[in-house]
UniProtKB/Swiss-Prot annotation:
This is Tryptophan synthase beta chain. InterPro entries: Trp_synth_b_CS (IPR006653), Trp_synth_beta (IPR006654), Trp_synth_beta/beta-like (IPR023026), TrpB-like_PALP (IPR001926), TrpB-like_PALP_sf (IPR036052). It catalyses: (1S,2R)-1-C-(indol-3-yl)glycerol 3-phosphate + L-serine = D-glyceraldehyde 3-phosphate + L-tryptophan + H2O. The modification N6-(pyridoxal phosphate)lysine is found at K84. Tetramer of two alpha and two beta chains. Gene3D superfamilies: 3.40.50.1100. The gene is trpB. HAMAP family: Trp_synth_beta. SUPFAM superfamilies: Tryptophan synthase beta subunit-like PLP-dependent enzymes. Its EC number is 4.2.1.20. GO terms for molecular function: tryptophan synthase activity. It comes from the Bacteria.
Length: 392
């Protein structure tokens, strides 16, 4: 595997002016990811500030319903409410070690923006967040939290006003002041070394999960995670990739149906192309124009995918399925009623696949679902969905 690629996917497709910053970032990442003092400081923050390790919870009522052993990796219990803080606090700490004073980030559901603003406040860094205007509207609570933490919010008005446009705006701002700004990428996407770096910082999810299963003397058969850009899935998948006995399943946003134009099922419906500095699978037309996407989830409506997932899809090491808005919302309500847990809409896509997977299994299986975030941020969206309001 070439340094910057996963199979045919990855690379660095940005202007020459960005190469200095990417090389500088790669050097700093390779240095500090092996530095004992950096690792000690980061691990202490993850333990005492973020709240790791997160539990691997046996969902007894779901297990009874589906007649399989269902476990939830509780990333929703992290400080700020999702897996995003694992990566954001690590990159912010790296930025500080590099002498940067200002960090910026893109965000869709607001969880990465919130995590980045939180890390910036803790570490004394200036912070600006780029967010599509549509997402600013549907994730108003997270916007207010970010502002309360001292971050400046840029509501991006171009295109569909969602995650793709926010990412484009953040890249433009970064390239415009590349010596002073550190861009905290929120998912396992973008030009190298970002996909590798984000996966490295999120891999703590899978490492913990593997140790927790060993303590329970359980062998996992299936791991299910929602996929937008792909950081939570990459985080829980990575330590299991070499174990062919473990089936890895990523769940994309099926929106109103993958046979309609209203979805974000990049691997199921996309083609190989270039987006945001990487070669990957992209939802695009025959002329290479990026197609509009839709999902009830602000965190999954992205027309690209991290290069690791494109590689796992092409190599058939992982399966990728789509779950519709309606299936997702039914799963969200089911978890509330069965386990007393309000999951994020993103995570509920992964939960919904249990309804499809479990009836097909011939033997009792151990299934882990990565519960990537909690649903506090989604209360208005859930109410609006019931009223028939459609965003994106």
């Amino acid at each position: 595997m070439k340094k910057a690629y996963y199979g045919d996917f990855g690379g660095q497709f940005l202007p020459e002016s960005a190469m200095f910053a990417l090389n500088e970032l790669e050097g700093a990442f390779l240095k500090f990811s092996k530095d004992k003092l950096f690792k000690k400081e980061l691990n202490e923050l993850l333990k005492t500030y973020v709240g790791r390790p997160t539990p691997l919870y046996f969902a007894r009522n779901l297990s009874k319903k589906y007649q399989h052993e269902i476990y939830l990796k509780r990333e929703d219990l992290n400080h700020t409410g999702a897996h995003k803080i694992n990566n954001a606090i690590a990159q912010a700490l790296l930025a500080k070690k590099m002498g940067k004073k200002k960090i910026i980030a893109e965000t869709g559901a607001g969880q990465h923006g919130l995590a980045t603003a939180t890390a910036a406040a803790l570490l004394g860094l200036e912070c600006e967040i780029y967010m599509g205007a549509t997402d600013v509207q549907r994730q108003a609570l997270n916007v207010y939290k970010m502002e309360l933490l001292g971050a400046k919010i840029h509501a991006v008005q171009s295109g569909l006003k969602t995650l793709k446009e926010a990412t484009t705006a953040a890249i433009q701002a970064w390239v415009g002041d590349i010596k002073n700004i550190f861009y905290v990428v929120g998912s396992a996407v973008g030009p190298y070394p970002y996909p590798k770096m984000v996966m490295h910082f999120q891999s703590i999810i899978g490492k913990e999960c593997k140790m927790q299963l060993q303590k329970l003397n359980k062998k996992v058969d299936y791991i299910i995670a929602a996929v937008g850009g792909g950081s939570n899935a990459a985080g829980i998948f990575y330590d299991f990739i070499k174990d062919e006995n473990v089936k890895l399943i990523g769940i994309e946003a099926g929106g109103l149906g993958i046979d309609t134009p209203y979805h974000a099922a990049t691997l199921n419906k996309g083609k190989t192309g270039i987006i945001h500095g990487m070669k990957t699978k992209v939802l695009q037309d025959d002329l290479g124009n990026i197609l509009p996407v839709h999902s009830v989830s602000a965190g999954l409506d992205y027309p690209g995918i991290g290069p690791l997932h494109a590689f796992l899809f092409e190599s058939k090491r992982a399966q990728y399925h789509a779950i519709s808005d309606e299936e997702c919302m039914q799963a969200l309500k089911l978890l509330c009623k069965e386990e007393g847990i309000i999951a994020a809409i993103e995570s509920s896509h992964a939960l919904a696949f249990l309804e499809k997977l479990c009836p097909t299994l011939k033997k009792k299986s151990v299934i882990v679902v990565n519960l990537s975030g909690r649903g506090d941020k989604d209360m208005q969206m859930i109410r609006d969905y019931k009223k028939g309001v459609i965003y994106g």
